[in-house]
Amino acid sequence: MEVQVSQASLGFELTSVEKSLREWSRLSREVIAWLCPSSPNFILNFPPPPSASSVSMVQLFSSPFGYQSPSGHSEEEREGNMKSAKPQVNHSQHGESQRALSPLQSTLSSAASPSQAYETYIENGLICLKHKIRNIEKKKLKLEDYKDRLKSGEHLNPDQLEAVEKYEEVLHNLEFAKELQKTFSGLSLDLLKAQKKAQRREHMLKLEAEKKKLRTILQVQYVLQNLTQEHVQKDFKGGLNGAVYLPSKELDYLIKFSKLTCPERNESLSVEDQMEQSSLYFWDLLEGSEKAVVGTTYKHLKDLLSKLLNSGYFESIPVPKNAKEKEVPLEEEMLIQSEKKTQLSKTESVKESESLMEFAQPEIQPQEFLNRRYMTEVDYSNKQGEEQPWEADYARKPNLPKRWDMLTEPDGQEKKQESFKSWEASGKHQEVSKPAVSLEQRKQDTSKLRSTLPEEQKKQEISKSKPSPSQWKQDTPKSKAGYVQEEQKKQETPKLWPVQLQKEQDPKKQTPKSWTPSMQSEQNTTKSWTTPMCEEQDSKQPETPKSWENNVESQKHSLTSQSQISPKSWGVATASLIPNDQLLPRKLNTEPKDVPKPVHQPVGSSSTLPKDPVLRKEKLQDLMTQIQGTCNFMQESVLDFDKPSSAIPTSQPPSATPGSPVASKEQNLSSQSDFLQEPLQATSSPVTCSSNACLVTTDQASSGSETEFMTSETPEAAIPPGKQPSSLASPNPPMAKGSEQGFQSPPASSSSVTINTAPFQAMQTVFNVNAPLPPRKEQEIKESPYSPGYNQSFTTASTQTPPQCQLPSIHVEQTVHSQETAANYHPDGTIQVSNGSLAFYPAQTNVFPRPTQPFVNSRGSVRGCTRGGRLITNSYRSPGGYKGFDTYRGLPSISNGNYSQLQFQAREYSGAPYSQRDNFQQCYKRGGTSGGPRANSRAGWSDSSQVSSPERDNETFNSGDSGQGDSRSMTPVDVPVTNPAATILPVHVYPLPQQMRVAFSAARTSNLAPGTLDQPIVFDLLLNNLGETFDLQLGRFNCPVNGTYVFIFHMLKLAVNVPLYVNLMKNEEVLVSAYANDGAPDHETASNHAILQLFQGDQIWLRLHRGAIYGSSWKYSTFSGYLLYQD
């Protein structure tokens, strides 16, 4: 059992190595005697090889060389010191004391193995020979120079003449030294090959021994495990079935030992501890020691186990007959059970297919039955008292549920899932007339409506061929709107609806036939709805106007219902009233019209307006005269969706007739839902003239909430008397998404924009900045200190005409864009939102068209004026503790549309716009402003509506006065509202995370000559330590934040004959290194640098691998680093 390692081959290899070494030492002795005639010689002592493991190495008895001749031996001192230098690279533990031990003595005494000693000795000898050859070549060149001088007639001194006579001898010595170098190189290569071969063979022998041990342990474990079986014990007790006879006493020893080595799992111990105990038993067994165990010794157990293994019984353990008989019935039982299972599955599948054929019924009716079981949690409380009608319906429809399983379209699985969702909604017909319709339900209805049209078309074609539609109308006379909601709830994929615009037309042509009788009794709710537009429009007419008016009349109910809903539900509810193919055309009426850019027409839409801007304006004015009252739908700020997920390629969709029921209905609802979302400070546009600006923001992003920007501006005078109180009297408070916070919104006279924060992630990127900020609690939110209402006044120092409400549409055509903003800026009043970033460009509404000033496309830059104006920003810490900008209120604009000059007492700034670089915020302390313009500056800043940051969905920023007269503190998302004549482009100002300021520079003022290898370099002078990240005591830089760092180091070598090696370390890894040595005792600099990507907690330091560093008060040796880019 005990493994014996044969070392005969290893000894043979090492003996050959010694022979090579002896030959090499003989040659080297001759060479050194010839090279160094006046110096002591190397004494190479090789004792007889007692064993391969202990090889006494070369010893050198002498001090380093000292040579007398100035001509040829000036570098021989260097040769001796080089021999002491190289060993330190590998294994020297004695420092740099050049006079203590001889170099080879110190090297060989510290060598870890004979091979390392051989390699070091050979390498030093070759270096010595190389230097001798170089010296002879120098001497040869000098002698050639002497000969040339003699030929030229120059007189030489006697020493020079004697040296010239030895020229031939020098040539001979040089040739001999070169040949000797070749011989030594060959010998050293052979020696190293023999060494490596011997090491490889030794390693293989060790590996085989380890494998044999492991194999033996596994065999023993197998034997001990099988000894626990009764029939195996009987065989050994009786010597049956080829087993060796064992006395019961010895068998008991083995059984007890098997319980120790192969124990059952002990839960009180960890697996590692338990296996460690077992391994100790196995180890002692392999050793065969005389230790006592289970009443005997390990040596005795080892003998017994060897006897069992050699018997051959365990090669194939015989199985008793009883065990075989038991195994057969078990297999038969398993087969029988599997057959039964297959038969049961077949019968179940047959029954299921029969039942599917039996219960094929129309697809619409099952919705009423199953809705009672799959009721939504939102509507459960309102429907508890109305559960009797479904039983009567169910009695009439016993065979309904299975119709859904018979659908054989490719998307049958999807329709099954849709049916369950649609069944949930069928009971909602009982509360069509109730004002307390859940807004969340309305949001879900609308998001599902747009993608359900293709399935609706299929289902309607099936239902028309059967008598079910008429029966369904008779059964549920009140459920027309509820049915549409059911159809809308069938789909969960809102991204599909823009692609399906073309498919909408067919169902709209089919459905009004079956819906018209029921709609005649419901059209009296609102007189503006005179013509059924489509199935969705008809179904929503009776429900929505009532619920909106009731919401206004009783705000308590609307507040409680809204508190559970995100702001998106308002925009969605409004958008859902209109068919999809007319929802897009309506945007022409509701957004600014000064955008003559050619656009793509959406699929399935129709436009009756000409493309020419002037003709379009005239046509719209003619159409407006046909409506009761005048509606200002002239603003065309269109959101340009450039996402690949959106199939709407429009930046200016075609228009619909403003007088259509769609437009009038939208006018009522959108004006009523003003400020339903968190308002944003916007530039007050003279187009509105004290109008009610509503921007229902919706999203077509992948988050599932699909909405679109709509802006409807309804002058107060143009609203019909019956609708004006509901739309203007008490606007509903907006809901902050996720936090259920109510905000008080300004009255309808203020010009503001509502922005939904969450869905902006997928819109076109203006500034790709996403700085997540921690949410704040509700109690931190304060009301705005500004008055909720104001009167917009226009103060201008020029003689130009006051702004008009309708302007020629040629204005933006003349807008000049700077080169860098062409990609991101949209002159049509686009509101760009992306990735938590917002940039709002209001419509340019000047009386005299003039080019807009270019602005700097830089992240976080505030875009200001170009001529004579100035942009003043002031760092201000907002209530949330985040840095933003403090922008001053705009002064009355001058005729060229720029800011008028602010007079500062302390200092003046140039009129050029300030461009900000990344992560840099300009901070100017404000001096006192002149009293004249301050009185008139209120007009541009009266609107103090609160704002919701795109970075924080559930909190509000409060805009508070900074207390410095007209200065106003801007929160990170405030956008200034300036005078209408000022052509200013306010931009979202991001709360960018402040980059850390990290930089350090350290130096040494004293020499560093450690006695051992690989020592850290510690600095004694700190020139700079910005950020307190460099530990002077340890000489280590601790990375404070993830980012890209730059490190530079310069180390001046001490004037010794030892080369300098310096490593730049990250933790314990060598990144870059520097080396300095020319072989002469002189100062040289080892330097390098690196640009590294570090993570927080990484440590950067310098390691002196070998050599010595020079230090002085002039600080030659330095180490510096700084943060380049923060992640």
UniProtKB/Swiss-Prot annotation:
Ca(2+) 2 binds at E1084. Residues 129-156, 194-216 form a coiled coil. GO terms for molecular function: metal ion binding; RNA binding; signaling receptor binding. Residues 993-1127 form the C1q domain. Keywords: Calcium, Cell membrane, Coiled coil, Cytoplasm, Differentiation, Growth regulation, Membrane, Metal-binding, Mitochondrion, Phosphoprotein, Protein synthesis inhibitor, RNA-binding. Residues 402-432, 440-464, 588-597 have a biased composition (Basic and acidic residues). Its main location: membrane. Residues 99-108, 512-531, 544-567, 665-714, 741-753, 956-970 have a biased composition (Polar residues). It is found in: Cell membrane. GO terms for cellular component: centrosome; cytoplasm; cytosol; mitochondrion; nucleoplasm; plasma membrane; receptor complex. It comes from the Eukaryota. Detected in all tissues tested with highest levels of expression in brain and spleen. The keyword Calcium applies. GO terms for biological process: cell differentiation; dorsal/ventral axis specification; negative regulation of cell growth; negative regulation of translation; positive regulation of canonical Wnt signaling pathway; positive regulation of dendrite morphogenesis; positive regulation of dendritic spine morphogenesis; positive regulation of transcription by RNA polymerase II. InterPro entries: C1q_dom (IPR001073), Caprin (IPR028816), Caprin-1_C (IPR022070), Caprin-1_dimer (IPR041637), Tumour_necrosis_fac-like_dom (IPR008983). Gene3D superfamilies: 2.60.120.40. Pfam families: C1q, Caprin-1_C, Caprin-1_dimer. Residues 67-108, 382-614, 642-753, 922-975 are annotated as: Disordered. The modification Phosphoserine is found at S948, S949. Changing I1048R: Impaired homotrimer formation. No effect on LRP6 binding although LRP6 phosphorylation is significantly reduced. Promotes phosphorylation of the Wnt coreceptor LRP6, leading to increased activity of the canonical Wnt signaling pathway. Facilitates constitutive LRP6 phosphorylation by CDK14/CCNY during G2/M stage of the cell cycle, which may potentiate cells for Wnt signaling. May regulate the transport and translation of mRNAs, modulating for instance the expression of proteins involved in synaptic plasticity in neurons. Involved in regulation of growth as erythroblasts shift from a highly proliferative state towards their terminal phase of differentiation. May be involved in apoptosis. Belongs to the caprin family. Homotrimer; via C1q domain. Found in a complex with LRP6, CCNY and CDK14 during G2/M stage; CAPRIN2 functions as a scaffold for the complex by binding to CCNY via its N terminus and to CDK14 via its C terminus. Interacts with LRP5. Interacts with LRP6. The C1q domain is essential for the function in Wnt signaling. This is Caprin-2.
